[in-house]
């Protein structure tokens, strides 16, 4: 009866309850507020939960709180690809905000193994309340507004104590672009009266949905690789503060209830994180969560599903930085009201649960302040000692690709991992690492556990069932040559800062014959695309050679770009200017040559040089295709190459003029709707010289449809099906899937 009554309140509220009724519904009964501070409803013009709030309105309300109250300060920490602001509202007592920089500096002593702190009484709990990394899980951003109001306007004793003892960093939306994509859809299809039927358009947003960012990337997997601007801005802010507690709010299937940590024991836990994080802090905070949710009658579950192993989530990255990362999952209304097996799930109800957990998180962070601060100090102190005991470290470096080196070093430095540029050659195993292209990461540092995360190959697991990724060795992801160094003497070199990363670019003298650019450079395609855009003829070497350059005789490998000067329509001065611009933009090096006669191998006029045709790329997208893979291709060509890609909904394939394109990309998906005529047209296009690129399941479709010749190896078959218990079916399916794996 309590549960049904709860939903009736939500439904009445959704029809336009008063501001007081809204406050009574969302907040604890003892809450008192400063009437000079506007409620979210007063600012927005509608009660929270009756519409999905646009990101600009979220930012506007937080800015208004900061303008009105000495308890709040709003900072812009970055912006999305679509130029939406990434903001953090810092909330604390006015005295703390006036002393904020000193509080921050004092707090950072906890992560410095050279400092010892025994008295935490004047320290503050730093609590990062993070919301809405998946844009179509929108309830948490709404709860962020209520959380901000609660602590900025609250007058009761609990709020005053929290503001005295803690600094709250409220990040209302990790993924504003995805959120607005979803919010626009949900608001556009909202009915009056509300339609709770799960098949209604409101509850089934169009491809690609709002879960992901502008490039259709799941930002909740990006805390480790930092591929996107939102994550880069957030990680910079994270390391400015090193919060003690970080929340990560999500939504799950409508027919579920509510989840909070602890996660599934052992099998879903990261091997480098000390046990006291899971056995101690997780269980300690769980007590606060269940008490708060019990108080409002919400159903929940713990210790099932979900993952603490992959370190690139918003709830796991903090664990590897001496903090407590916390994931919360709420059954989604995916709109404003939806039927479920337990009744109707209203948007306001989902918001209230996340608000309740937010307040409980702050309550626990204040009550357990000494425990959290001691945990963080001990974490980095023990990491330093473990690293010193392990000794040595890791040496890496690609002798041929400085762009790759720079990108990987940049990732390490963003994660505050000490990295040294070696000033002498070193041989380890079967590899020789050359100075100026060799780097060393010592184990003896406070970030030792992050060092392990980036370099160690974890091949032994407690459980064979993974929620998501099963491998995350970053050095392998970069295809980086590396070896473990076990020497007793520390290797010498310059400790790097991000400002030291300059790339290979160096001004090249003007050539009258040709310029050469090595293709093994990570960003060579970017330079190539720039030159093609400028109308230059560029050739590619299909055989190696060596030749006299402005820096003496050098060897050049397969794919080397050769830009002859004489055959260009532009004069030699303009060609030189384009070469300078291209190499500076891409961070690669060009070589000037004065003769086409090689020292060995092919000459520059050889038929083994092929003229490169500028790619005109087409990719089919839309329902039935993988938005994740399509987004990866799009982001790669946009950010790494600067090459435009035409994205066409596969239902519009009949409108394509195939003569305008020379490259077709098919990501995983169902292409059965293309039909025989389209398949035959693609076959003809390939015969005429078009390049077809298929990813994953699209390759199977291409073979099955006769676009390409090929066959696949068959896996083992069971002659007699094995009987299984229904209770183990889910785990059995999971044991046959390996997510996020790396094959070496």
Listing of model-derived features with the role each one plays in the protein:
Residues 238-252:
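Proline-aspartate-enriched helix->loop->beta-strand connector
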Residues 1-24:
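Bacterial Sec-dependent N-terminal signal peptides
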């Amino acid at each position: 009866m309590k549960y049904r009554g709860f939903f009736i309140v939500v439904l009445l509220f959704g029809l336009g309850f008063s501001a007081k009724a809204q406050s009574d519904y969302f907040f604890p009964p003892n809450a008192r507020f400063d009437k000079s501070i506007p409620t979210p409803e007063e600012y927005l013009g509608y009660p929270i939960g009756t519409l999905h709030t646009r990101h600009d309105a979220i930012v506007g309300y937080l800015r208004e709180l900061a303008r009105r109250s000495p308890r709040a300060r709003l900072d812009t920490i970055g912006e999305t690809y679509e130029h939406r602001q990434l903001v953090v509202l810092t909330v604390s007592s006015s005295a703390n905000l006036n002393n904020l920089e000193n509080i921050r500096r004092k707090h950072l002593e906890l992560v410095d193994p050279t400092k010892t702190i025994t008295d935490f009484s004047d320290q503050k709990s730093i609590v990062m309340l993070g919301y809405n990394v998946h844009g179509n899980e929108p309830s948490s951003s709404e709860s962020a507004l209520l959380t901000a109001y609660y602590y900025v306007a609250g007058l009761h004793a609990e709020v005053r104590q929290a503001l005295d003892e803690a600094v709250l960093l409220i990040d209302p939306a990790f993924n504003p672009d995805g959120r607005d994509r979803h919010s626009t859809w949900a608001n556009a299809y909202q009915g009056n009266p509300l339609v709770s039927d799960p098949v209604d358009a409101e509850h089934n947003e169009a491809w690609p949905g709002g879960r992901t960012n502008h490039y259709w990337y799941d930002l909740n997997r990006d805390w480790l690789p930092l591929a996107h601007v939102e994550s880069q801005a957030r990680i910079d802010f994270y390391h400015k503060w090193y919060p003690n507690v970080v929340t990560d709010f999500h939504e799950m299937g409508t027919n579920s209830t509510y989840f909070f940590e602890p996660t599934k024991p052992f099998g879903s836990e990261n091997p480098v994180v000390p046990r006291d994080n899971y056995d101690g802090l997780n269980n300690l905070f769980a007590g606060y969560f269940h008490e708060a949710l019990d108080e409002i009658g919400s159903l929940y579950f713990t210790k099932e599903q979900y993952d603490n192993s992959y370190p690139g989530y918003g709830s796991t990255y903090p664990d590897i930085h001496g903090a407590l990362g916390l994931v919360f999952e709420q059954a989604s209304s995916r709109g404003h009201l939806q039927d479920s097996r337990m009744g109707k799930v209203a948007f306001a109800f989902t918001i209230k649960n996340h608000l309740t957990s937010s307040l409980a998180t702050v309550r626990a962070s204040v009550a357990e302040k000494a425990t959290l601060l001691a945990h963080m100090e001990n974490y980095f102190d023990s990491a330093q000692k473990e690293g010193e005991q392990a000794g040595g470290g890791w040496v890496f470096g690609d002798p041929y690709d400085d762009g790759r080196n720079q990108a990987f070093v940049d990732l390490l430095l963003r994660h505050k991992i000490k990295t040294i540029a070696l000033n002498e050659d070193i041989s380890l195993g079967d590899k020789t690492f050359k100075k100026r292209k060799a780097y060393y990461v010592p184990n003896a540092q406070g970030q030792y556990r992050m060092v392990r995360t980036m370099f160690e190959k974890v091949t032994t697991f407690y459980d064979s069932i993974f929620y998501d990724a099963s491998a995350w060795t970053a050095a392998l992801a970069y295809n980086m040559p590396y070896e473990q160094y076990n020497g007793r003497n520390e290797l010498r070199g310059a400790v790097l800062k991000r400002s030291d990363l300059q790339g290979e670019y160096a001004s090249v003298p003007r050539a009258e014959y040709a310029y050469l650019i090595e293709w093994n450079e990570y960003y060579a395609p970017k330079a190539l695309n720039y030159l093609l855009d400028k109308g230059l003829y560029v050739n590619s070497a299909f055989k190696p050679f060596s030749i006299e350059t402005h820096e003496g005789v050098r060897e050049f490998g397969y794919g080397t770009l050769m830009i002859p000067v004489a055959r260009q329509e532009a004069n030699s001065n303009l060609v030189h200017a384009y070469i300078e611009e291209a190499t500076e933009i891409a961070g690669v090096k060009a070589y000037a040559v004065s003769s086409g006669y090689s020292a060995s191998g092919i000459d520059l006029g050889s038929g083994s040089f092929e003229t490169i045709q500028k790619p005109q790329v087409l990719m089919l997208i839309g329902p039935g295709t993988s938005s994740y893979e399509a987004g990866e291709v799009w982001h790669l060509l946009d950010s790494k190459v600067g090459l435009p890609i035409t994205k066409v909904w596969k239902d519009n394939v009949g409108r394509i003029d195939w003569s305008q394109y020379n490259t077709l990309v098919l990501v995983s998906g169902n292409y059965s709707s293309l039909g025989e005529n389209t398949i035959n047209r693609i076959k003809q296009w390939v015969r005429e010289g078009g390049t077809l690129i298929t990813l994953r399941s699209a390759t199977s479709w291409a073979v099955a449809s006769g676009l390409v010749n090929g066959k696949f190896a068959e896996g083992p078959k069971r002659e007699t099906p094995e009987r299984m218990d229904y209770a183990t079916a889910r785990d059995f399916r999971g044991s046959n899937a390996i997510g996020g794996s790396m094959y070496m």
